[in-house]
Swiss-Prot record:
Keywords: Cytoplasm, Lipopolysaccharide biosynthesis, Transferase. GO terms for cellular component: cytoplasm. It is an enzyme of class 2 (transferase). It comes from Vibrio vulnificus (strain YJ016). Pathway: Carbohydrate biosynthesis; 3-deoxy-D-manno-octulosonate biosynthesis; 3-deoxy-D-manno-octulosonate from D-ribulose 5-phosphate: step 2/3; Bacterial outer membrane biogenesis; lipopolysaccharide biosynthesis. One of its GO terms (biological process) is keto-3-deoxy-D-manno-octulosonic acid biosynthetic process. Belongs to the KdsA family. Disulfide bonds: none annotated. Its EC number is 2.5.1.55. One of its GO terms (molecular function) is 3-deoxy-8-phosphooctulonate synthase activity. InterPro entries: Aldolase_TIM, DAHP1/KDSA, KDO8P_synthase. This is 2-dehydro-3-deoxyphosphooctonate aldolase. The keyword Transferase applies. It is found in: Cytoplasm.
Amino acid sequence: MMEQKIVQIGDIPVANDKPFTLFAGMNVLESRDLAMQICEHYVKVTDKLGIPYVFKASFDKANRSSVHSYRGPGLEEGMKIFQELKDTFGVKIITDVHTEAQAQPVADVVDVIQLPAFLARQTDLVEAMAKTGAVINVKKPQFMSPGQVGNIVEKFAECGNDKIILCERGSCHGYDNLVVDMLGFGVMKKASKGSPIIFDVTHSLQMRDPSGAASGGRREQTVELAKAGLATGIAGLFIEAHPNPDQARCDGPSALPLDKLEPFLAQMKALDDLVKSFASIDIR
């Protein structure tokens, strides 16, 4: 059987054969107070359930569809909020970067820096992120086949960084729709020689409105999609939640209501424990 790589995020070992790690939080930093509220809730629930946890939020949504859409507080204010979250809750942080100049200042504060799906083939950005020495979460582009992720992992390795986590977030299926190929998780593992795979359930539920300026979504299907992904044996889940998804400033239609977080994660942990209790069956 293929050996599974372990990527350490501080004291958290992330691997496809380890108990699942949760990358989760809110889509974008809407305010300091809301970030504190959401992070505190995640920390309480994950501590109670014994789930390794990394808080996620964006400080700048640089790829919004409309020029009028909210982007976030920006780099300087965003890093201040992240540092306060770390100091207050002792939580690890993941956030995305969009330019080479952002890579090091962000890596100086957070624990994982994320390469956005739309930018995953940009070599200059890959090189800048690799040079920070940080753990990298690579969003697989919607236009890229699962087998092609090996090229991204190789590019980071050539730039001196092998601390790579891969994130599935769905593939384009015609116009304005995304689907998740459950066979793709195994292909990604093989193509990357056992890199940890995280499943971004929230963004896989996006469904664009061809006449609108923002994405729609199918949050009512969060549970079934997350269960299907975990059943393949992966390293973790990526989830966004909000106390009032209909009022969220980005991707509310795909966000999990915050009051559903504990029952949702309790089911996910039970399923992950069951799947990883099975002996491997090597079929050739």
